[in-house]
């Protein structure tokens, strides 16, 4: 299906919107499945609660605003799923509900609904939760077999340090298995740890022409080059750690909040990669993907303005 893009607000036929949303949901299923494998029923509850709260909030908002019901476009389902995959496994469920309500009501419907929101709703909710529930959002439990990555034992079963925490300290000796980074047997948010599952999903979206390669490649390549020049930690660990892959492939590529031209997408991806590494290197929080993408969301209209081809004859 060939998609024609224009500057926001984006207006799509219902079928095109719902089909795109379904494709992204399908692409996230491998990562969701891995989260259940490593975390167990806690992941199932987080995903179910976030999706349910997002859908209910969408319905209530549309009724309150006296606008057409938009549940059928699956955008609320996708927002709930993305938010859940960006949450730590032991987060209290009421906090997940609060984040879902914020994502739909504040970050999306206040601006008029899908196509009008300037910032990615799931990332906006995650930023809100990091500020509001800092302790819960930065407490991690060990996945199955976590000792294969960090040497942790059953004594450490309640909480653990994520790879990004070790990377920020420069203590790469604690990270012993690249295979575990690829397969997801590491601490972190439930849907961000299995690089293979996320890359399979991204490949599916590219084949389906739902996204292009420009943002994911420029985002991750910028991170790699930055880490290469910075030294200290192997660049591949930066790319495979935290929310880099899920952010680059599934959040930075959001149609509504990202540039519309190939050149603009590359500029956007480079900006996301640079900001992510700057925040990781100099910020107080070891992760920077969410805030980097949100900052670049704000710059998207400017990028669109300067990267759109000029009409023939205009100087």
Predicted segments with their positions:
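A generic, well-ordered mixed alpha/beta core segment in the N-terminal half of proteins
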Residues: 75-151
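N-terminal signal-anchor module of multipass membrane proteins
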Residues: 1-55, 62, 310-313
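Long hydrophobic alpha-helical segments that form multi-pass transmembrane helix bundles
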Residues: 116, 121-198
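Loop-to-transmembrane alpha-helix initiation sites
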Residues: 118, 122-123, 236-244, 264-268, ...
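Hydrophobic alpha-helical segments embedded in the membrane of multi-pass proteins
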Residues: 26, 52, 74-82, 97, ...
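Cytosolic-side transmembrane-helix boundaries in multi-pass membrane proteins
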Residues: 1-22, 259, 279-315
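C-terminal ends of transmembrane helices
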Residues: 8, 56-68, 104-115, 200-208, ...
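Structural signature of hydrophobic alpha-helical transmembrane segments
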Residues: 40-53, 90-99, 181, 185-195, ...
């Amino acid at each position: 299906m060939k998609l024609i893009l224009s500057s926001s607000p984006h207006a799509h036929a219902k079928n095109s919107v719902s089909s795109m949303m379904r494709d992204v949901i399908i692409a996230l299923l491998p990562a969701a499945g891995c989260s259940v494998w490593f975390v167990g029923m806690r992941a199932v509850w987080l995903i179910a609660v976030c999706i349910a709260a997002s859908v209910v909030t969408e319905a209530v908002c549309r009724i309150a605003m006296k606008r057409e019901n938009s549940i059928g476009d699956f955008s609320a389902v996708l927002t709930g799923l993305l938010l859940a995959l960006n949450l730590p496994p032991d987060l209290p469920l009421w906090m997940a509900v609060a984040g879902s309500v914020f994502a739909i009501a504040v970050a999306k419907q206040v601006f008029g609904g899908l196509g009008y929101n300037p910032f990615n709703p799931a990332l906006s909710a995650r930023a809100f939760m990091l500020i509001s529930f800092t302790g819960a959002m930065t407490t991690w439990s060990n996945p199955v077999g976590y000792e294969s990555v960090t040497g942790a034992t059953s004594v450490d079963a309640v909480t653990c340090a994520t790879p990004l925490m070790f990377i920020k300290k420069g203590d790469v000796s604690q990270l012993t298995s690249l295979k575990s980074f690829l397969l997801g047997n590491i601490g972190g948010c439930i849907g961000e740890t299995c690089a293979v599952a996320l890359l399979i999903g991204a490949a599916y979206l590219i084949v389906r022409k739902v996204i292009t390669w420009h943002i994911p490649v420029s985002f991750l390549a910028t991170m790699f080059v930055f880490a290469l020049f910075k030294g200290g930690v192997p660049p591949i660990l930066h790319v495979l750690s935290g929310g880099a892959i899920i952010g680059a492939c599934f959040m930075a590529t959001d149609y509504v909040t990202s540039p519309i031209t190939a050149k603009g997408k590359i500029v956007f991806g480079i900006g996301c990669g640079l900001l992510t590494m700057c925040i990781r290197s100099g910020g107080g929080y070891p992760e920077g993907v969410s805030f980097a993408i949100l900052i670049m969301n704000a710059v998207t209209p400017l990028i669109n303005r300067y990267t759109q081809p000029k009409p023939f004859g205009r100087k």
